Amino acid sequence: MSTDNIKKVLFKPFLFILFLIPLFSVFIGAAEGGPCKDYGECDDFKYSLNDFESLQRGAATYINYCYGCHSLKYSRWGRVAKDLKVPEDIFFENLVFDKSIKPGDLMTGSMPAEESAKWFGVAPPDLTLVSRYKGDDWIYSYLRAYYEDSSKQYGVNNLVYPGTAMPNVLLALQGNQRLVCKDVPIIARNGGQKRDENGITITEEKCGFLEVENGTGKLSKEEFDSLIYDLTNFLVYVGEPAKATRERIGWYVVFYFLIFTALSSLLYREFHKDYNKH
């Protein structure tokens, strides 16, 4: 076999694999977001698993507002405290209300499944892996897409998950959100806004926009969005506690492959020189 053939056999498949690594990561990232139904495109969410303050706030929000119904049965109290860099005694004092719970116990929730099914029509699901099968974009959009709907049992509906059986437990924080109509510019075929002979933008009424009534919530829009960010960030962590470590190691692996490729190329040149001598 000639040296050119050896080069093709050894290096082309290797370079092809290196090309696929970033491409595959793009596909994985795209798969994280799920469809958002009537909401349209899901809002973009960028998790930050090294922001421990965000994760700590998200854990506090989850335990105070969500854990009563939704368990995290694949997580352990002590592991969460350790990963979020909260001293175990402080974590248990402030976030664990059942003093019989131990650090090694699973976060199995406090609501019996049979009773909750009677109350809500369906047992609230465990949310340990919700970020894995729904996507972080979906969670972030869903928690901000509740609106008033008097035709529903709990008086609310959701654009991302129409007909949701879950009440808006964060209503007091967000405020009363409604669907409203707005005048929006008509878009021309060239992508610009249509204007009349006087240069005034032509508009049309469209409905389905979410708007919070002023003064009905404890938090401002920015504060509520920040709270939902922290909560979603925490759920991303819970879905894969080792995710930040995996991604960090992944960069080292890519760097190793690049160095290995460079060294292999230099080694090939040396072998090629010796081959030509003979």
Show which residues each predicted segment covers.
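Short, aromatic-rich amphipathic segments at membrane interfaces
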Residues: E213-W251
